[in-house]
Amino acid sequence: MELRHLRYFVTVVEEQSISKAAEKLCIAQPPLSRQIQKLEEELGIQLFERGFRPAKVTEAGMFFYQHAVQILTHTAQASSMAKRIATVSQTLRIGYVSSLLYGLLPEIIYLFRQQNPEIHIELIECGTKDQINALKQGKIDLGFGRLKITDPAIRRIVLHKEQLKLAIHKHHHLNQFAATGVHLSQIIDEPMLLYPVSQKPNFATFIQSLFTELGLVPSKLTEIREIQLALGLVAAGEGVCIVPASAMDIGVKNLLYIPILDDDAYSPISLAVRNMDHSNYIPKILACVQEVFATHHIRPLIE
């Protein structure tokens, strides 16, 4: 049995069709069918139910599929890590969500550069969900994100829980709560601007889930492309916007930022790495996180 046989089988399962899998794998359909039959003969089990369209996996086939996916994932990770170790001049590719640039991430990266001048750093903007795929494919080595996305191949380290704020125009009627804060239930009738409109799940879907978990339904939601535009529209009186506290540093004029008092009104900032990756740059970047947080009197969640 070779890795290509596992890859063929996994593709057929995921495409639910021999013809679609053959097209995706860029091979003819008859040879692919023969390879699947040979795999069944070698294993001594039937992987697919006969006569079903779309292709239906047997119970034994599904068990084998789950393990085949793990084998292919681990093999890809091992290959990626081996290539990196063999590279004389080490390059560290760091994925990040753009909103973190308004917080402490730039200080963390700068400190890491100063302490590790031998490591070349490439910064790659990508959403939290995209970071998971990029990590598994070896396109990035670390990912700084905000969303809680689980994957068996990825280890997620929560660094900090950043408070959420409600951005309003300084003359908005909710300005009376600037010092005391508001609950989400108090703002469901306000025109609400959400960002971004990129691939979901994203920060907008995260905010919507906070309302859903409390049984609340905002009356008017408008999705905006990015945080700067959303805050600019708030300054123009178009509505209100929920943002991480670090967004205050963007510096849009005529805005107030009101604390949101609900228990889960925070945005987790996390570092994502491959489960099999035990490279020394991971503890080094975590040490930089702790050092930068300490200068800002923030207690990190890592030890």
Curated annotation (Swiss-Prot):
Cellular component aspect of the GO annotation: protein-DNA complex
Record function comment: Positively regulates the expression of catA, catBCIJFD and benPK in response to cis,cis-muconate. It binds to the catB-catM intercistronic region, to a specific sequence upstream of catA and to the benPK promoter region. Can also repress pca genes.
UniProt entry keywords in alphabetical sequence: Activator, Aromatic hydrocarbons catabolism, DNA-binding, Repressor, Transcription, Transcription regulation
Recorded family membership: Belongs to the LysR transcriptional regulatory family.
Listed InterPro entries: HTH_CatM, LysR_subst-bd, Tscrpt_reg_HTH_LysR, WH-like_DNA-bd_sf, WH_DNA-bd_sf
Upregulating conditions: Negatively autoregulated.
UniProt-recorded Gene Ontology molecular function terms: DNA binding; DNA-binding transcription factor activity
Ligand binding (cis,cis-muconate): S99, T128
Originating gene: catM
Protein name as catalogued: HTH-type transcriptional regulator CatM
Matching SUPFAM superfamilies: Periplasmic binding protein-like II (SSF53850), Winged helix' DNA-binding domain (SSF46785)
Record domain HTH lysR-type: where: 1-58
